[in-house]
Swiss-Prot record:
It comes from Mus musculus. InterPro entries: Ig-like_fold (IPR013783), Ig_E-set (IPR014756), Papain-like_cys_pep_sf (IPR038765), Transglutaminase (IPR050779), Transglutaminase-like (IPR002931), Transglutaminase-like_sf (IPR036985), Transglutaminase_animal (IPR023608), Transglutaminase_AS (IPR013808). It catalyses: L-glutaminyl-[protein] + L-lysyl-[protein] = [protein]-L-lysyl-N(6)-5-L-glutamyl-[protein] + NH4(+). One of its GO terms (biological process) is positive regulation of keratinocyte proliferation. This is Protein-glutamine gamma-glutamyltransferase K.
Amino acid sequence: MEGPRSDVGRWGRSPWQPPTTPSPEPEPEPEPDRRSRSRRGGGRSFWARCCGCCSCGNRGDDDWGPEPSGSRSRGTSSRGRDSRGGRRPESRGSGVNAAGDGTIREGMLVVTGVDLLCSRSDQNRREHHTDEFEYDELIVRRGQPFHMILFLNREYESSDRIALELLIGSNPEVGKGTHVIIPVGKGGSGGWKAQVTKNNGHNLNLRVHTSPNAIIGKFQFTVRTRSEAGEFQLPFDPRNEIYILFNPWCPEDIVYVDHEDWRQEYVLNESGRIYYGTEAQIGERTWNYGQFDHGVLDACLYILDRRGMPYGGRGDPVSVSRVVSAMVNSLDDNGVLIGNWTGDYSRGTNPSAWVGSVEILLSYLRTGYSVPYGQCWVFAGVTTTVLRCLGFATRTVTNFNSAHDTDTSLTMDIYFDENMKPLEHLNHDSVWNFHVWNDCWMKRPDLPSGFDGWQVVDATPQETSSGIFCCGPCSVESVKNGLVYMKYDTPFIFAEVNSDKVYWQRQDDGSFKIVYVEEKAIGTLIVTKAIHSNNREDITHIYKHPEGSEAERRAVEKAAAHGSKPNVYATRDSAEDVAMQVEAQDAVMGQDLAVSVVLTNRGSSRRTVKLHLYLCVTYYTGVSGPTFKEAKKEVTLAPGASDSVTMPVAYKEYKPHLVDQGAMLLNVSGHVKESGQVLAKQHTFRLRTPDLSLTLLGAAVVGQECGVQIVFKNPLPVTLTNVVFRLEGSGLQRPKVLNVGDIGGNETVTLRQTFVPVRPGPRQLIASLDSPQLSQVHGVIQVDVAPASGGSGFSDAGGDSRSGENIPMAYRGGA
């Protein structure tokens, strides 16, 4: 088991406060000038490394024939034209470049250009499932071949030698996989090879195979040739850079997924649902992952750079996912998002106001500063974007009644005084109403067999792991079976989903005694978006055995035996005959409500129960405020009878105390006079917020302006001030912020906006509203975008990205 985690992070009792001004790290060192790099590895040493079996240099230069005297030369050629002067479509390359005196000798094999077939409609992008990326460069997935065309100054001959080069990082080395040499027509090392598929005189069609273990990232690309007349090297051209990603379609890749519908959902879907609230009152919001938006891929790679992750480790999905979990939060390393659970978001954006990841990631890429602010669903949404973009099958997961174990006991310990009133100064463990993290799919070669598949990655900074704020990847299978000694961070994740809630009461002598153990209170429902639908999928069964089953109890006790309180189960008391259930009325914010406690006597004797009810507001992280209403009542139950106690709560009573998410916590404790049985229950519930209503105004066509109408009714009798709308949708609208001023109490407003779709197909346009008085207001509409006239699938026009406009309302009305 790993060492204990630190007591700093994402709950209210922490002394940590978000920094007023995030401080960026120094930017990464600039890479050496491309021209100096183009000379690296030239001449005899380069060709010696073109061994057909490996890069060991066992083949000497003589294998390529004697080097002609004075053969190293430099020359030029018109970009985009073949040797006959005709226009060469889609050609890339800006001339020629060879070491030496700059002379192009007669008979030298000169590469005048390269076509990487990298447009979105070309074969490479379609076959590699990268055609949705809003990039002009070639983007391929490792372990899968791609095609290119070399344009030559003369016909290719059997005696000619051609080698492709891929380089990444500031100091590329063959032994570290950062300098890849691929001899054309010969087998390379580690699965790299290039074959001629068609020789059309001056054009050479190649099929290039990449290694399924290749480093991911953006590679520089060049071509070298050697002939009897001399050597030549194509100069580096930024337009010829190649992105290589993980490949869930490749059986040899560690991230391989053997279900096409999973790949479509968990790799290619650009939007999804994130669930929040409480188990009894589940809320859902649509999130724009936007992994294919222009700039997002560069932002994802920048994250690895900012962490200083060695390039040699970027081919390992376990290492990459762990770095991502550390870098999506800002603690330790000035990562992407600043966490804030204080309720004061005046120096940034309320976490509830975000509608997607694109604005966050592009801001981080553009400025290098951590973005304020995030909470668990924002960290998870951004993590899904980053991992899907890099090629992981990833989903966003919500765990309701998620425990936060601060002392590695693997139990949730709650302390009460003699009258069963919570002792908040002792209650360091907390139960979050919900917590959102990620599952990503991969093999685990670093673990024994049986732990492949879904792995938990959690970027929310709760506790440290190996000294940094990260969590995972952790095998879900190890969590299910209580194998808390498996890396990474299994004890913490196990406690989140399957620990027991232990109630301790202070005795007359000051000691504490266990008076109640609630075995079914933690991890009560674990959900994610279903494949190919907006329905909710219950995945609790993959995290834990059926609640109360022998296998589930074994897993809990096995895990607890490795915790800091291994003997907690030895002190448990006898069975009970009075059952208690808590219910809360489903209410919208601004309305009155009621909470009820139902008692049932399951025994054969009369029972008298003395109840205490304490009501307070609570953050979704389990941090509660002071009690603002309480009630006491004695209930007498005949054998087999039930009775209820109801406590009404008026809007004016809870309004002054409301915090984020509109959640409340009811602490109920009771004592059965006849048997001494102790009753205890904590019940959270939330006030619902309204939705935004979105209506499309006309048909959506690529490259043509389209309108949308947004309608909102203020449910509160008070004015909403400084109201901000956000609008975003991949392929439709770049992130847009709209300042609309104030909205009166119970007022209905209508807002109209336009956007220009840039990609066809079904899309999601997502909006949110935020103000100091009301947040967590969202809306979404599906937009089916038709291709532009003429069949063009994509538009070069970008969505309107103006930000911070003051927008007049199209219509204002009363209640």
